[in-house]
Amino acid sequence: MSASAVNVDPAELGKFAAHAARWWDAGGAARPLHDLNPVRVQWIAARVALRGARVLDAGCGGGLLSEALAARGARVTGIDLTPQLIEVAKLHLHESGLDVDYRVQGAEDLARAEPEAFDVACCLELIEHVPDPAALLRALADLLRPGGALVLSTLNRTPRAFVGAILGAESLLRLLPRGTHRYARFMRPSELAAMLRDAGMQLVELAGLGYEPLSRRAWVSRRVDINYLALARKPG
């Protein structure tokens, strides 16, 4: 399938493909994801039943979240449109001994092939990288069984998020490669809630994600003005 046939920005794929080889290096370009991952997984596990559940990790990258969910007993399918990252994710399974079904595939394509196949869908740090986030959310809703849960994380479109995620993380501290984020694609919670409603889902919980890059400490907070987590439910 060509890039034009799916909800993808080729420039975004190129950014992440360039760092595929060091995805599992906790001191590399994916360092913030390594630091945030345990906190995010704990937040997810406190809200949805993972053991035995069929879980989708959309935009799985090199598999950080997928493996953590599989370690908690979930039956995980990880999808990403960057072949280099899927290859890294598959190779890392030889080290971890975990079982994850990795595929080079987009959510829209998977929704056509396997509608209502998942109990839980996770979409972390992806929605701000696609050209049509509403289409992505509709596909994720279609992939969920009635009563299923959707977990998202993204960046709020606020001055504080611009300073922290772009000026700070990319330009000053160089924690992320320059150009990783585009401020115009950051999403306010109210915008996310509206898109979820249009997709037939309901936003039920928001939480902020705090991160101190120098100490590499991450935590859940009440402030959602930079990075935030969201839980939505499909009726049923």
Specify the residue positions occupied by each region the protein language model found:
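Conserved alpha-helix/loop element of class I SAM-dependent methyltransferases that forms part
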Residues: H34-R51
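A short acidic, Gly/Pro-enriched loop at the edge of an enzyme's catalytic core
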Residues: A111-V120
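Class I SAM-dependent methyltransferase SAM/SAH-binding core
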Residues: G62-D109
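N-terminal, positively charged/glycine-rich alpha-helical extensions of SAM-dependent methyltransferases
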Residues: M1-W24
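Conserved class I S-adenosyl-L-methionine
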Residues: A53-G59, V151-L173
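Acceptor-substrate binding/catalytic loop of class I
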Residues: R174-E191
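A short glycine-rich, Lys/Arg-flanked "PGG" loop and its adjoining helix->strand segment in the class I
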Residues: A134-A149
